[in-house]
């Protein structure tokens, strides 16, 4: 508070900006350059700072337009410590970044001068990644997706051509005993409430050539149980939904088991988020 009063700073954001400006001047004296996470935007950027844009793309876009170099690393595409598939069958963490999300990353939006974007970066924070094998699982195949999109312009990326290459990399990873995630084969479960308040469940997958089978009767699903064709409504007295994916009449994804209460909770959370937009 004394420093804020002495420098006539109105709030903590301006205090942070004051600190960053001082740090930049010290670094310049040492022949170094300041790079900071995009919180350094708050309160005013130092003149020559480079911004690591992680809270989405907007901070990076704004900074690039203002003449600052930017490294794009938005959470929704680049945080590979997040779930990469159905949370109930993934290691515990706090949000979602699927393989397809990483592959859809374009670090150079059309609205900014390309020369101001230095590149992109994938981030694997280790708070919930206790072992090297776990780190491998979180890194691959999303690391391959980020490598391709960061080295290839968006005009040359193609999801339907990419994921078959991922499968070829799986063979190489098996030979090298590298631990990787097969989450792209698992079903995507999206519960929601219709306009008339009825819970429905949409099932999908990241790949376009998988069949999805399900049960509501507490038995394990296979290719002889009902095949998903359209959004599901929950039968009376059902307490569990079980789902599995098949390809060429062979199981390929994990069996996903969710209680109806969990589905209701997820649908409620989605409804609350949408309602607050």
Task: Label the model's feature ranges.
Residues 14-22, 55-58, 115, 134-138, ...:
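Generic recognition of stable, solvent-exposed alpha-helical segments in well-folded globular domains
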